[in-house]
């Protein structure tokens, strides 16, 4: 099941995924196609002191996004902070990317308190709807959840639960892990 152009919503502790993910490619042979947005909205999570003096968009830079995706000629990067709708805290950055051939993507990075890490992880492990995968070699603990074909990487590190979502062509685990490494190297 895919819901075109929908937004992926990840809710702390309760983990609810509204219609999301799927869709576009990087566009080849001059065919530009748009990927759906994938901002992460951290609804009602405990307040956490944010890195980068609160400018979470410093998490990733243009150089962190692969420049060799087939059919593209480099990416133009615009960063947009998304305000938490419940607590009013600025917790999420959405990266608006446009390639030279018009393809677009909106990966995102959010920061949550680690207070509910164990319970949120158990919910993910027990879920029959969204495939869970343990991810070694990243932070103190990490796991991947696939929601409607959309990968979301959760990383526990440096006092944060870091939530990284990607949309095509940045949705594979190695790329999400490279984003996590870049973030952890800057915090």
Task: Report each predicted region and the residues it spans.
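Bacterial N-terminal signal peptides that target proteins for export
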Residues: 1-9
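C-terminal motif of bacterial Sec signal peptides marking the signal peptidase cleavage site
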Residues: 15-18
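Short Gly/Thr-rich strand-loop-strand
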Residues: 116-152
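Active-site beta-strand termini and strand-to-loop segments that position acidic
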Residues: 95-100, 145, 155-158
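Extracellularly exposed regions in secreted/surface proteins, prominently low-complexity, repeat-rich
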Residues: 148-187
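A short acidic-to-branched-hydrophobic micro-motif
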Residues: 90-119, 162-166
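N-terminal "mature-domain start" segment
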Residues: 20, 26-90, 161, 176-187
């Amino acid at each position: 099941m895919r819901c075109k152009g929908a937004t992926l919503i990840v809710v702390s502790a309760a983990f609810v995924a509204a219609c999301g993910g799927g869709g576009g490619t990087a566009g080849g042979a001059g065919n530009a196609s748009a990927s759906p947005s994938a901002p992460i909205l951290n609804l009602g999570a405990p307040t956490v002191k944010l890195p980068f003096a609160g400018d979470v968009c410093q998490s990733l830079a243009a150089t962190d996004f692969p420049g060799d995706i087939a059919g593209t000629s480099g990416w133009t990067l615009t960063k947009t902070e998304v305000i938490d709708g419940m607590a009013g805290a600025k917790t999420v950055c959405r990266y608006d990317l446009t390639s030279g051939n018009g393809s677009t993507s909106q990966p995102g990075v959010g920061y949550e308190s680690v207070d509910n890490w164990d319970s949120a992880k158990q919910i993910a492990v027990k879920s029959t709807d969204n495939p869970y995968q343990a991810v070694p070699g990243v932070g103190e603990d990490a796991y991947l959840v696939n929601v409607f074909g959309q990968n979301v990487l959760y990383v526990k590190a440096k006092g944060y639960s870091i939530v990284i979502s990607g949309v095509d062509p940045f949705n594979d685990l190695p790329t999400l892990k490279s984003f996590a490494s870049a973030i952890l190297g800057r915090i």
